[in-house]
A protein has these predicted regions:
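Conserved ABC ATPase signature
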Residues: 114, 139-143
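The feature captures the beta-strand-to-loop junction immediately N-terminal to the Walker
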Residues: 38-40
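Conserved ABC transporter NBD signature motif
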Residues: 29, 61-69, 78
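Catalytic Walker B motif of ABC-type/P-loop ATPase nucleotide-binding domains
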Residues: 164-168
């Protein structure tokens, strides 16, 4: 793992439905890290991810991705470097697992003269990596919640990007599937050297899976640091207005919230 900044957000301002959400925000993300953004509802977490991915047009500021100003890049050029999975991704009614994962190859279709067989090999490799190859021809609508989320992760993986943004990837999943998806992301982070930036609501899961945590409130970044630096009673009181009791996970020594009032 390096200390190189792969993504830098400088002086960015964002609005949603004519309401200023983020004003002159600065934040950087280190290559190869799993960075988790936490904060109360409505604080701007999802808005920030949408602004970085250009789904939401910024009003001012600069975003630098892999030393390149994103304003100078086309949508397809960005899609080769950065993937974004929204909170509630949906597939066409009759789309199969393979159909959805193949969408991740879209940025390469017009310029690469690859045979269909070559593209199938790439998609099959991705499906195998996320343990979905046997379900490749199944309709996505027939899958469990955890399997569906693996499909979306596979689509992002097929993009062959260095950075993946995920907005609450564990939403609507039961606890077992939450752990399954986060373990998959951790594995991809290690094996593919993938930089992962995600929003999570569960503080203990955020602490467990993050290398770096970012605390947001009222459209501002108030705290940044390791889980041990962020998961403290004063910081959680400031962010969430809770009185938290913090302990230590005996397995990985990460901080955990034992109770809060």
């Amino acid at each position: 793992m390096t200390n190189k900044e792969i993504l830098s957000v400088k002086d960015i301002s964002l609005s949603y439905q004519q309401r200023k959400i983020i004003k002159q925000l600065d934040v950087s993300f280190i290559e190869g890290n799993i960075s988790v953004i936490i904060g109360p509802n409505g604080c701007g977490k999802s808005t920030l991810l949408k602004g970085i991915s250009r789904l939401l047009k910024k009003e001012s500021g600069q975003i630098v991705l892999d030393d390149l100003n994103m304003d100078d890049l086309s949508t397809k050029e960005i899609a080769k470097k950065l993937a974004f999975l929204p909170q509630s991704a949906t597939a066409p009614e009759d789309a199969t697992v393979r159909d959805v994962v193949e969408l991740g190859r879209y940025p390469y279709q017009s310029m690469l003269k690859k045979k269909a067989a070559d593209e199938k090999i790439i998609v099959d490799e991705v499906l195998s990596q996320v343990n979905l190859l046997e379900l490749a021809e199944q309709p996505v609508k027939n899958l469990s919640g955890g399997q569906k989320q693996r499909v979306w992760v596979a689509m992002a993986l097929a993009q062959k990007t260095a950075v993946v943004l995920l907005d609450e990837p564990t939403t609507y999943l039961d606890l077992g599937h939450q752990i399954d998806v986060l373990n998959l992301l951790k594995e991809l982070n290690k094996t593919n050297q993938m930089t992962i930036i995600m929003v999570l609501h569960d503080l203990n899961l955020a602490s467990r899976f993050a290398d770096y945590m970012i605390g947001m409130k009222d459209g501002k970044i108030l705290y940044q640091g390791s889980p041990k630096e962020i998961m403290t009673p004063p910081i959680l009181q400031d962010l969430f207005a809770i009185n938290a009791i913090i302990g230590e996970d005996p397995i990985d020594q990460k901080p955990i919230c034992l109770r809060f009032d």
